[in-house]
Swiss-Prot record:
Lineage, highest ranks first: Eukaryota, Metazoa, Chordata, Craniata, Vertebrata
Subcellular location: Cell membrane
Gene that encodes it: PTAFR
Family: Belongs to the G-protein coupled receptor 1 family.
Bilayer-spanning residue ranges: 17-38, 55-74, 92-113, 134-155, 185-205, 234-254, 277-296
Record protein name field: Platelet-activating factor receptor
């Protein structure tokens, strides 16, 4: 398979799409994940963190690492894909993007496996020292993924290309592959196949969880509520994977082949457009991950519900106070002026 020479491809719609999408994700993601960390710090002493809570906190931290780089990417796309910031920040942004993506995949995977064990082996899971295992697994995940991502810190991450007007040059960030590079292709094949291996394991575990829960007889209303929440959690995890991660990894390998020059220019443009959309979908996991926590921990869900009803009550009280004042003031203003003089 010989590489073809092809001109630089661009998808100009991304200069409008990314600043809008990333701005929304940044605001919602910082609020949601910041609130999650605050709730965990307030409700749970560190010594009482079980395995599932350890994974949740680590997943939130991975999301926050990506969120702090979003302003850098917003500036980049607002400048028509021109990296005007210091070069090392491009390396940092690319490194944290990789860390967030695959830490999220890994922690969602171990969360799913935790629930799989809880459903299929409830007694053994209840007796196990899951806190120690949670800490150990989290350390392994961070060391492995940060170690792999450190490559992006030493990589020559920027390259110069002519701008769309042809009047000058722009500096791209992580948008250049050497044509025909077999090592780059092998790395991407490994990443994509590793992802789909994890996804198939998660899909299998979730299907077993759903089947087991549906086969269990429901004897009490409380058990029905627990089962409903567990099913929603499973569906939410699958939705996050299918919406955020699967489209990107379906497109990633064909896009890499096109970038390396192994596909014709017509296909290259189409796959590049699709790649930009999947990058946007990939970043939405920072907003969707906190939704999973509502189905995983009772205290978190209770705290969120109490805050919601507290806000509603405050609005009702405020509205009632305003109505009362209006009822008093309006009749007073309708009193004839001559009667006030008597």
């Amino acid at each position: 398979m010989e590489p073809h020479d092809s001109s630089h491809m661009d998808s100009e719609f991304r200069y409008t799409l990314f600043p809008i999408v990333y701005s929304i994700i940044f605001v919602l993601g910082v609020i949601a994940n910041g609130y999650v960390l605050w709730v965990f710090a307030r409700l749970y002493p560190c010594k009482k963190f079980n395995e599932i809570k350890i994974f949740m906190v680590n997943l939130t931290m991975a999301d926050m690492l990506f969120l702090i780089t979003l302003p850098l990417w917003i500036v980049y796309y607002q400048n028509q894909g021109n990296w005007i910031l210091p070069k090392f920040l491009c390396n940092v942004a690319g490194c944290l993007f990789f860390i967030n993506t695959y830490c999220s995949v890994a922690f969602l995977g171990v969360i799913t496996y935790n629930r799989f064990q809880a459903v299929t082996r409830p007694i053994k899971t209840a007796q196990a020292n899951t806190r120690k295992r949670g800490i150990s697994l989290s350390l392994v995940i961070w060391v492995a993924i940060v170690g792999a991502a450190s490559y992006f810190l030493i990589l020559d991450s920027t390259n110069t290309v002519p701008d769309s007007a042809g009047s000058g040059n722009v500096t791209r960030c992580f948008e250049h592959y050497e044509k025909g590079s077999v090592p780059v292709l092998i790395i991407h094949i490994f990443i994509v196949f590793s992802f789909f291996l994890v996804f198939l394991i998660i899909l299998f575990c979730n299907l077993v969880i759903i089947r087991t829960l549906l086969m269990q007889p429901v004897q009490q209303q409380r058990n029905a509520e627990v089962k409903r929440r567990a099913l929603w959690m499973v569906c939410t995890v699958l939705a996050v994977f299918i919406i955020c991660f699967v489209p990107h990894h379906v497109v990633q390998l064909p896009w890499t082949l096109a970038e390396l020059g192994f596909q014709d220019s017509k296909f290259h443009q189409a796959i590049n457009d699709a790649h930009q959309v999947t990058l946007c979908l990939l970043s939405t996991n920072c907003v969707l991950d906190p939704v999973i926590y509502c189905f995983l921990t009772k205290k978190f869900r209770k705290h969120l519900t109490e805050k919601f009803y507290s806000m509603r009550s405050s609005r009702k009280c405020s509205r009632a106070t305003t109505d009362t004042v209006t009822e008093v003031v309006v009749p007073f203003n309708q009193i004839p002026g001559n009667s006030l003089k008597n």
